[in-house]
Amino acid sequence: MVKGIWVSTSHIPDLGVAAFVGDGEGLRELHIGSSVTSAVDLIGPENLDVADKVSETARVVSGYSVRDIIGAWRSGEDLSDLALRPIGTPFQQMVWSGLRTIPRGQTLSYQAFASTIGRPSAVRAVASACANNRLGLLIPCHRVVRSDGSLGGFRWGLERKRQLLAWERAS
């Protein structure tokens, strides 16, 4: 077992259960499900297979307890100093970095977003990077929608995507 990788779960009112995966350098994954089992089932095997046991132990990342991260996100607090360690290709990393620049409460189409990162012909690759984002909320792929304004897809379901966008617009 690789030391230092941990999984922690926390109930989030009105949203479900969040499963966080981290290590000594930051968060690797964040998933939301309707139960502990459904949230943990979304964790990538490369992390879950080597993690210490799943627990509700409060973990701290960049000074935030995992229970406080969602509260900070909901209140609109700037979380740019939160150490994130997403695992992906260089292109995915570029997309995920760009997603963090979309202002809270706003959306962009996949086409418009691809243009903002200087890759206007990479719309499908952008959509694929969004689909492979394992740090939803903190890397806000929910802010990217189809050109016609419809929601498109979302790892945690379209109802959650709709709910997240509504919360952001209201705050």
Regions found by a protein language model. Give the residues of each.
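Basic nucleic-acid-binding alpha-helical/helix-turn surface characteristic of O6-alkylguanine DNA
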Residues: 1-120, 171
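Regulatory, non-catalytic segments
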Residues: 123-133
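Residue-level signal for inorganic ion chemistry
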Residues: 99, 113, 141-142, 164
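…primarily DNA-binding HTH/wHTH and HhH modules…
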Residues: 147-171
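Extracellular LysM carbohydrate-binding repeats and other cell-envelope/extracellular binding modules
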Residues: 135-138
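LysM (lysin motif) carbohydrate-binding repeats in extracellular/periplasmic proteins that recognize
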Residues: 120-123, 164
